[in-house]
Amino acid sequence: MYSLIRKCLFSMDAETAHNFSIQALKLAGKLPINVLPMPLNPVEVMGLQFKNPIGLAAGADKNGEAIDGFGKLGFGFIEVGTVTPVAQDGNPKPRQFRILEAEGIINRNGFNNLGVDVLVENVKKAKYDGIIGINIGKNAVTPIERALDDYQICLRKVYEHADYITVNISSPNTKNLRTLQYGEALDDLLRSLKSEQESLSQKFNRYKPLVLKIAPDLTDEEIASVADGLIRHKIDGVIAGNTTLSRDPVVGLKNAEQQGGLSGKPLNTLSTRLISTLAEELNGTLPIIGSGGIHSVASGQEKIDAGASLLQVYSAMIYQGLALIQNLAKHIQVR
């Protein structure tokens, strides 16, 4: 069945196919039946109860338009965004490219979204009863020196409506964003956002975990530095990781020369290395959410065995269809 759907979707360019899928899932979300059952494989992470350890990665539903539709596919949690303080168009099109032979995707979207206020309204309307994370970023026009302002604006606006909040400082498609992963810039950001989290938890009388999303391109030394910052500032979790700038796994393939972040199956080895190195440095002090390149139960389990407590998928679903979510949710064994 999915082979027919995929043939139809792949006859369109990647972004048109994505937008079509979001509209279809919005419609599915309004139907009174589940498309697929919610597999029960419960796990507790960051003080939150997940019905199963498989989540939708950020970037799939940037504006929270199709939460209920995605929820009917069997995800134990859904992360929406990345969202910015005000709406922005992102980078010029075309900006999404399939690497068919490798089951990969390159994107240079640049945080295209309708703004945090629209996302919050969509989250408020959603009926999905799983865990919802909201992924926040900065506007392209905001100087990197003022990035904290954007993250604070978003954190304040989404806090009441999220189960957890992810701080995205690792997209390669927003100028200088990845510099926030290093040294004093990271220290200042984490310190300020942790303070904001504490204030908001008192205001709303509920603690919402704060998660950092990092790049798979960090060196071992840089991973150790990030881990140290996460521990010192008592950040609640880390997503390992975002898309990669490396083209080593897809060299010579059609579209491999396109600029942007590479996701999908080619990212698998790099993201598992990131999880493994991070797990060594963190030594169990905070949980890791594994993301990047998961395309089978074996590749997902590999990330759990490397140190992840939860998993996120997106690109592989485009190539393989909905059965992948069901298989992962049923068969992944969290240690």
Swiss-Prot record:
EC number: 1.3.5.2
Biological processes, Gene Ontology terms: 'de novo' pyrimidine nucleobase biosynthetic process; 'de novo' UMP biosynthetic process
Membrane topology recorded in Swiss-Prot or TrEMBL: Peripheral membrane protein
PROSITE patterns assigned: DHODEHASE_1
A cellular component term, taken from the record's GO annotations: plasma membrane
Superkingdom to which the source organism belongs: Bacteria
Active-site residues annotated for this sequence: 171 (nucleophile)
A GO molecular function held by the record: dihydroorotate dehydrogenase (quinone) activity
UniProt keyword annotation of Membrane present: yes
UniProt pathway: Pyrimidine metabolism; UMP biosynthesis via de novo pathway; orotate from (S)-dihydroorotate (quinone route): step 1/1
Major localisation: membrane
Keywords for the protein's UniProt record, in alphabetical order: Cell membrane, Flavoprotein, FMN, Membrane, Oxidoreductase, Pyrimidine biosynthesis
Pfam families documented for this protein: DHO_dh (PF01180)
Binding site for FMN: 58-62, 82, 135, 168, 213, 241, 264, 293, 314-315
Cofactor names: FMN
UniProt subunit comment: Monomer.
PANTHER family from the UniProt entry: DIHYDROOROTATE DEHYDROGENASE (QUINONE), MITOCHONDRIAL, DIHYDROOROTATE DEHYDROGENASE (QUINONE), MITOCHONDRIAL-RELATED
Family: Belongs to the dihydroorotate dehydrogenase family. Type 2 subfamily.
HAMAP family tied to this protein: DHO_dh_type2 (MF_00225)
Function: Catalyzes the conversion of dihydroorotate to orotate with quinone as electron acceptor.
Protein name (database record): Dihydroorotate dehydrogenase (quinone)
Organism of origin: Actinobacillus pleuropneumoniae serotype 7 (strain AP76)
Gene symbol of the encoding locus: pyrD
